[in-house]
């Protein structure tokens, strides 16, 4: 057995030594250039399936930009809106996402459409392809690029038929519009929901302070302690003025009447009665007990201040809601189609002249490299 193996090795060495570098160089062009070019031409002639491309250009605008009649010098100078640029990049990521692929597969039966590739094994999509492979194949069939100078998003879609390439692009635009609308409306809804929540809190606080005010009025049987205290103070001042006048009249009587004169006694009694009334009215205004007008006025003022503060706060929240609605409507974003997708008339892929030129260039470079390498080896052997 060992003898047979040694014999086979010796035979192979003899055959290899019989092949000279000159023989390799003689057939190198056929191996490196002609054979690969023949394979490429056979693939292009027999196996390759033509693919058509539909193209559209879109921009993302805010509603106030569309309604504004003012001249935007930034756009004239080629500067894009930073907010629109950010939204365009968001949309680009969404178009290349599995979510967009799922929507397209549901509407266009994407997997089924690209599984019918004929003999084109290089561009065939297996019906049993994994989710990762399916997504990679999808990204190879769509190209989304953003131009930061014009702010436009260029969308190119491919299909094995002109009709599918067009339908592919139209569906991408429809889903993109839905995504932009949902994104902008969701932000507006969140802002409005927050404003409405704050308004509801302010309304509850206002209702609570009003209920506290009504309860205080009912429990103390008083409408406005401040007004009543003011009226009582005015009455006391009036009575004190009357008392001063009566005391002056009494002193005048004493100038010509005795102390026990009926007129003097009557005047003194009247002054005492008036003083008693003054003391009674003063006791209603100020006293250590908690049911007096001065303490009631302080408590009432505090409750009334709460009502006024909560009323102003509620008004502010109502104004905030209206401003939020206007601002949300102003900032709503729309997908503006600048160039609509068209039905392609000619296939775009494969680009046969380009492929042949590139393939020939690569083969020639490889041929030259190997030619040089063999020449170096030949020199060393010599």
UniProtKB/Swiss-Prot annotation:
Record bears the keyword Cell membrane: yes
GO biological process terms held by the UniProt record: polysaccharide transport
The protein, known as: Capsule polysaccharide export inner-membrane protein KpsE
Keywords, alphabetical: Capsule biogenesis/degradation, Cell inner membrane, Cell membrane, Membrane, Polysaccharide transport, Sugar transport, Transmembrane, Transmembrane helix, Transport
InterPro entries: Bact_polysacc_biosynth/exp (IPR050445), BexC_CtrB_KpsE_VexD (IPR005705)
PANTHER family: FERRIC ENTEROBACTIN TRANSPORT PROTEIN FEPE (PTHR32309:SF13), TYROSINE-PROTEIN KINASE (PTHR32309)
Main location (coarse class): membrane
Record's bilayer topology term: Multi-pass membrane protein
Function noted in UniProt: Involved in the translocation of the polysialic acid capsule.
Membership in a protein family: Belongs to the BexC/CtrB/KpsE family.
GO MF annotation list: carbohydrate:proton symporter activity; protein tyrosine kinase activity
GO CC field: Gram-negative-bacterium-type cell wall; plasma membrane
Membrane-crossing residue ranges in chain numbering: 28-48, 357-377
Location relative to the cell: Cell inner membrane
Organism of this sequence: Escherichia coli O6:H1 (strain CFT073 / ATCC 700928 / UPEC)
């Amino acid at each position: 057995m060992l003898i047979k193996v040694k014999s086979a090795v010796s035979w192979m060495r003899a055959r290899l030594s019989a092949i000279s570098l000159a023989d390799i160089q003689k057939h190198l062009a056929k191996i490196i250039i002609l054979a690969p070019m023949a394979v490429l031409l056979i693939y292009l002639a027999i196996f390759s399936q033509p693919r058509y491309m539909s193209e559209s250009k879109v921009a993302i605008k805010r509603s106030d930009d569309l309604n504004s009649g003012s001249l935007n010098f930034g756009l004239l100078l080629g500067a894009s809106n930073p907010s629109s640029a950010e939204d365009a990049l968001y949309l680009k990521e969404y178009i290349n996402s599995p979510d967009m692929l799922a929507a397209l597969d549901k509407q266009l039966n994407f997997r089924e459409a690209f599984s019918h590739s004929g003999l084109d094994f290089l561009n065939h999509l297996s019906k049993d392809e994994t989710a990762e492979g399916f997504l990679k194949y999808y990204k190879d069939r769509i190209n989304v690029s953003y131009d930061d100078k014009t702010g436009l998003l260029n969308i190119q879609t491919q299909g094995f038929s002109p009709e599918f390439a067009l339908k592919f692009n139209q569906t991408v635009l429809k889903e993109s519009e839905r995504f932009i609308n949902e994104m902008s409306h969701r932000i507006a809804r969140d802002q409005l929901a927050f404003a409405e929540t704050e308004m509801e809190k302010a309304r509850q606080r206002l209702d609570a302070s009003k209920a506290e005010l009504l309860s205080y009025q009912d429990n103390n049987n008083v409408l406005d302690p401040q007004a009543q205290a003011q009226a009582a103070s005015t009455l006391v001042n009036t009575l004190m003025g009357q008392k001063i006048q009566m005391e002056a009249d009494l002193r005048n009587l004493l100038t010509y009447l005795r102390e026990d004169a009926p007129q003097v006694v009557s005047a003194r009694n009247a002054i005492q009665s008036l003083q008693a009334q003054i003391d009674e009215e003063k006791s209603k205004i100020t006293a250590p007990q908690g049911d007096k007008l001065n303490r009631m006025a302080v408590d009432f003022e505090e409750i009334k201040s709460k009502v006024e503060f909560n009323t102003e706060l509620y008004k502010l929240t109502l104004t905030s809601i209206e401003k939020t609605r206007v601002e949300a409507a102003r900032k709503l974003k729309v997908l503006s189609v600048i160039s609509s997708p068209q039905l392609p008339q000619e296939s775009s892929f494969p680009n046969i002249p380009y492929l042949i030129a590139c393939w020939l260039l690569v083969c020639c470079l490889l041929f030259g490299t190997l030619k040089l390498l063999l020449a170096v080896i030949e020199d060393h052997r010599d």
